Regions:
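Membrane-helix boundary connector in multi-pass membrane proteins
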Residues: 100-109
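Alpha-helical segments in soluble extracytoplasmic regions
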Residues: 22-101, 114-129
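Sec-dependent bacterial lipoprotein signal peptides
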Residues: 1-15
Length: 131
């Protein structure tokens, strides 16, 4: 969770033009949120987490991912960097929506299995965007 807070602090800085380094930082943030969400989902699937923990933590992660999506959507970039910015913003939104679903159904093991797999895929996609 400390990593997520540090990443959020870095994500909020800058002007309206997105640099390659900022995109990398934000994509890494999305990767972090998705990977952490996948771990929570795995815990739900294996009945190792309380519903209260799942609700609180997925709410935090979903809001953090949504903040990154908002930041990316408010920035501008040119050429291929703008396409990557759009892809990262869509991915941040998808991560946020998946985390919100887990938040609403913190004890649903079947849904957790599905979302865990999706969040792992999202984390891999975000890692690729960060390169």
């Amino acid at each position: 969770m400390c990593l997520a807070v540090t990443v959020l602090a870095l994500v909020g800085c800058g002007d309206s033009t997105l640099s390659s380094k900022e995109l990398q930082t934000q994509a890494e943030a999305v990767q972090s949120f998705a990977a952490e969400g996948a771990l929570v989902a795995k815990g739900v699937e294996q009945a190792r987490m309380t519903e209260t923990f799942v609700r609180v933590h997925t709410d935090y992660l979903a809001k953090a991912a949504r903040k990154v999506e908002t930041e990316l959507s408010s920035k501008q970039a040119s050429g291929s960097l703008d396409r990557k910015r759009e892809d990262a913003a869509r991915l941040a939104l998808l991560v946020s929506l998946n985390l919100e679903r887990l938040h609403r159904h913190p004890g649903d093991q079947a849904l957790a299995r599905e979302l865990g797999s999706e969040l792992e895929d999202d984390a891999a996609a975000a890692e690729k965007l960060a390169k």
